[in-house]
Amino acid sequence: MSVETQKETLGFQTEVKQLLHLMIHSLYSNKEIFLRELISNASDAVDKLRFEALSKPELLEGGAELKIRVSFDKDAKTVTLEDNGIGMSREDVITHLGTIAKSGTADFMKNLSGDQKKDSHLIGQFGVGFYSAFIVADQVEVFSRRAGTPANEGVHWSSKGEGEFEVATVDKADRGTRIVLHLKNGEEEFADGYRLRNIIKKYSDHIALPIELPKEQAPAAEGEEVPALEWETVNRASALWTRPRTEVKDEEYQEFYKHVAHDYENPLSWSHNKVEGKLEYTSLLYVPARAPFDLYQREAPRGLKLYVQRVFVMDQAESFLPLYMRFVKGVVDSNDLSLNVSREILQKDPIIDSMKSALTKRVLDMLEKLAKNEPEQYKGFWKNFGQVLKEGPAEDFANKEKIAGLLRFASTSDDSGEQSVSLAEYLARAKEGQDKIYYLTGESYAQVKNSPHLEVFRKKGIEVLLLTDRIDEWLMSYLSDFDGKGFVDVARGDLDLGNLDSEEDKKAQEEIAKDKEGLIERLKAALGESVSEVRVSHRLTDSPAILAIGEQDMGLQMRQILEASGQKVPDSKPIFEFNPAHPLIGKLDAEQSEERFGDLSHILFDQAALSAGDSLKDPAAYVRRLNKLLVELSV
């Protein structure tokens, strides 16, 4: 054994301690996944060596065949996994094995609940890789040397998973990494060739380089020389995406997803496609079953694994799919790109634009198929990724109609509040003569469901979509129509129901408006600069008044988003609409005292603002006027 120098003991990052605690206390019922995780890491290390060796062939140090070896020692109760990939320096080891250098760590830790089943899903999403070794081991040793560094710059890392680790410099002749697991009592089953072989075949058959185990050998007879150790490859060792679809089982696709996405759950859907002709490439795209922690961080790492002629080039190649598809995982293998392609080149290459367009359509087709054939599965997709898909119409004009068809909304058709109504379903239920798609945005389902803006629609039996996500008003600014039918915000402008209003209704509305001209003028004078206009409402049947938004004005949702982010909000004033048939409006019209008329007008205005989900500019004045009115009524 080589002499250790520069030995030091260091503490784990707090988040790592928490993870290790969960591991050591048997969070996983399926312990065998530790081997899948370690093999996946080893495969990544070999991929990185292949890529770096394109420009620095000396890193191959003689060009030994790239492979992963798994061995065991029953007597010592150890399992050893070794790769001849890129390896790690002392600094790499401290960084990668002592901390979690990943965005969203704090959010991830906040979400841990103590519920083992739930937490296993969360940890699965987060991806723990190396730390899974502590599921079966009470001590883990790592010996590594980075390719291209001298043999005396190897590193030895060791930990019992209790809060600290030791690291020392050692001699290591071969580049790459060797991990030795000292199995816990009760985990001896893993120091067995048959067991390890089955685990590798089950989880890692798709890994595109040989995974070797020692060949089973008959024990040497007494006096005979012990034969030299022979190794045999136990996996297919071919890139899964290069095989014909008909030869790949669903289970293989699922295991490959777990490898490429570092996820513990099966994907929701996948699409495997080979393109030949002007462009030649193969893609294997997956839609996950759950959202990652950093889904709403638009600057978080994303993208596909990029291979060029089956040689790994880069992780997180973001140029192949638009930002609103950042949840998609998978690989793309091109025959047309150069092996020395860079991220900067990817952003400017016309070949990439063509591939991006085709891959985007393929994902949308996959989602359409899921929505049509597996509606319950699509509900799960929408719950996890719907808000991100809503970014699509603004980013991807060419596919706007296709994306719109995948959107789901709550509506007045039921009281569940569930976002399950597609635009096609809405139009299929539309009233005869209805040529518009009506919607209302707001802060919450309860607020929009009970909004006075819906009264005339309920009376006439017209369905209205209820939009309550913060992104919705912004989304609708990019959707002008669907299937030839325009969108109408029922809280905006002067409501026109078109053919759904009879000529008699329209004539009656005009006569009432003319009859109430005097009241309109009095209200304008009383409300003054608070409003842009006062008019008789065509929307109301039960409430006395509402506030409408000007046709070109910014809606409440967008105003609140801008205010919250500290941005300047354009000035605008609401339109005050009143219901001439309401008793309160009748009393208001008959009020002789201008002071009392003014108080009542402002109370109605403030109540209309509250019912729209807005906050009052002067709550104290509202309370004062209301108390004054209550005192007068109680006398």
UniProtKB/Swiss-Prot annotation:
Coiled coil: none annotated. It is found in: Cytoplasm. Residues 344-560 are annotated as: B. Its main location: cytoplasm. One of its GO terms (cellular component) is cytoplasm. GO terms for molecular function: ATP binding; ATP hydrolysis activity; ATP-dependent protein folding chaperone; unfolded protein binding. Keywords: ATP-binding, Chaperone, Cytoplasm, Nucleotide-binding, Stress response. Belongs to the heat shock protein 90 family. Residues 1-343 are annotated as: A. Residues 561-635 are annotated as: C. This is Chaperone protein HtpG. Homodimer. It comes from the Bacteria.
